[in-house]
């Protein structure tokens, strides 16, 4: 892979650090009044999700990580692994708990997800930005019960719990933003 100099660091760049693939979250170039310029970089380890803050002198370089982001279809979960399929080659990959992390609460069969692969193995899974899921359990909204914030918890078909307006009932399908976990709207059938 290519080497990236500190002047090429930007948010989202994937590099190797201490033998692990990392993604740059933040990069701040600092030029003190006296001394050599440096870059203060915040990186996320793609294997375990830990965030590191490192300082690099101006002119230092890091090796680029051989990481690919691939759109794959979620097929099923067998309890231990989540299985994904490449829609062009029909090749299947299985991701473990550490790769799926919080995305598991939004995954619905046949959804298209962004899977980050390193050496052909899934490192992380990003669900679609919006998903449509059925409410399997929520309290009934009583007429005139609007004194509070106007929301109630609802359990979705995947097990996720989101706050929904009082008028939403069990059995309805709602649209949820997976990045924030917020209710967006209800889907008419």
Curated annotation (Swiss-Prot):
PROSITE patterns found in the cross-reference section: EFP (PS01275)
Record-linked Gene3D superfamilies: 2.30.30.30, Nucleic acid-binding proteins
Any Pfam family hit: EFP
GO term, biological process aspect, one: peptide biosynthetic process
Protein's UniProt keywords contain Protein biosynthesis: yes
Molecular function terms from GO: translation elongation factor activity
Keyword hit for Zinc: no
Keywords recorded for this protein, A-Z: Cytoplasm, Elongation factor, Hydroxylation, Protein biosynthesis
Chief localization: cytoplasm
PTM field: May be beta-lysylated on the epsilon-amino group of Lys-34 by the combined action of EpmA and EpmB, and then hydroxylated on the C5 position of the same residue by EpmC (if this protein is present). Lysylation is critical for the stimulatory effect of EF-P on peptide-bond formation. The lysylation moiety may extend toward the peptidyltransferase center and stabilize the terminal 3-CCA end of the tRNA. Hydroxylation of the C5 position on Lys-34 may allow additional potential stabilizing hydrogen-bond interactions with the P-tRNA.
Subcellular location: Cytoplasm
Highest taxon, organism lineage: Bacteria
Pathway field: Protein biosynthesis; polypeptide chain elongation
A GO CC annotation given for this chain: cytoplasm
Modified residues (N6-(3,6-diaminohexanoyl)-5-hydroxylysine): 34
Listed NCBIfam families: efp (TIGR00038), PRK00529.1 (NF001810)
UniProt xrefs under HAMAP family: EF_P
PANTHER family in alphabetical order: ELONGATION FACTOR P, ELONGATION FACTOR P (EF-P) FAMILY PROTEIN
Recorded family membership: Belongs to the elongation factor P family.
Function: Involved in peptide bond synthesis. Alleviates ribosome stalling that occurs when 3 or more consecutive Pro residues or the sequence PPG is present in a protein, possibly by augmenting the peptidyl transferase activity of the ribosome. Modification of Lys-34 is required for alleviation.
Entry protein name: Elongation factor P
UniProt source species: Alcanivorax borkumensis (strain ATCC 700651 / DSM 11573 / NCIMB 13689 / SK2)
């Amino acid at each position: 892979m290519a080497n990236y100099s500190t002047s090429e660091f930007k948010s989202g760049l994937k590099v190797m650090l201490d033998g692990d693939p990392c993604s740059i979250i933040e990069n701040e170039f600092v030029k003190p009044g006296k001394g050599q310029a440096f870059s203060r970089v915040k990186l996320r380890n793609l294997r375990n999700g830990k965030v590191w803050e490192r300082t690099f002198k101006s002119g230092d370089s890091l090796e680029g990580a051989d990481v690919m982001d691939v759109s794959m279809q979620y097929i099923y979960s067998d309890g231990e692994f989540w299985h994904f399929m490449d829609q062009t080659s029909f090749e299947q990959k299985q991701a473990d708990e550490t790769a799926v992390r919080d995305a598991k609460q939004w995954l619905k069969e046949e959804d298209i997800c962004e899977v980050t692969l390193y050496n052909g193995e899934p490192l992380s899974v990003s669900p679609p930005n919006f998903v449509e899921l059925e409410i399997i359990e929520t309290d009934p909204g009583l007429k005139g019960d609007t004194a509070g914030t106007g929301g109630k918890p609802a359990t979705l078909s995947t097990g996720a719990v989101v706050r929904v307006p009082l008028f939403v009932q069990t059995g309805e399908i709602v649209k949820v933003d997976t990045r924030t976990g917020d209710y967006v709207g209800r889907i008419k059938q």
